């Protein structure tokens, strides 16, 4: 199992996926969809409420800071229909969750000056994350 990503000119009108078999990819998928202006509807997110933090609440709140109006239509679901609001701050809280920090890192390319607070939390699973990230974006 897994996901293969590739670049092409085809644009998805709306990304829909059941992530119950791979819930840990939800956060980067959500942020990637927002950054690429791709509406989405994700299901199978039931376990995200009981991770290092309530990831559904956390990603909804932090994406909201950047102006993305995510919606929770039902427990275990999250969607975004391209609702945009004003960006209120460029400081992203991680809630001491390594996956929150890593998921929002690419937003720094779009939002100059983005600050990921408690960024060292990535050491839980990927101590060299920020060094690798710097190699990718430099």
Protein language model features and the residues they cover:
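Conserved phosphate/oxyanion-binding catalytic-loop motifs
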Residues: 98-101
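Short, recurring structural edge motifs at helix starts
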Residues: 16-20, 45-48, 90-93, 115-123
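C-terminal structural cap/anchor segments
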Residues: 21-80
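Self-splicing inteins and homing endonuclease
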Residues: 1-21, 66-96, 110-111, 134-138
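Structural signal for terminal/edge beta-strands and the immediately following C-terminal loop/tail
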Residues: 113-138
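Short helix-capping/linker segments at secondary-structure and domain boundaries
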Residues: 35-42, 109-119
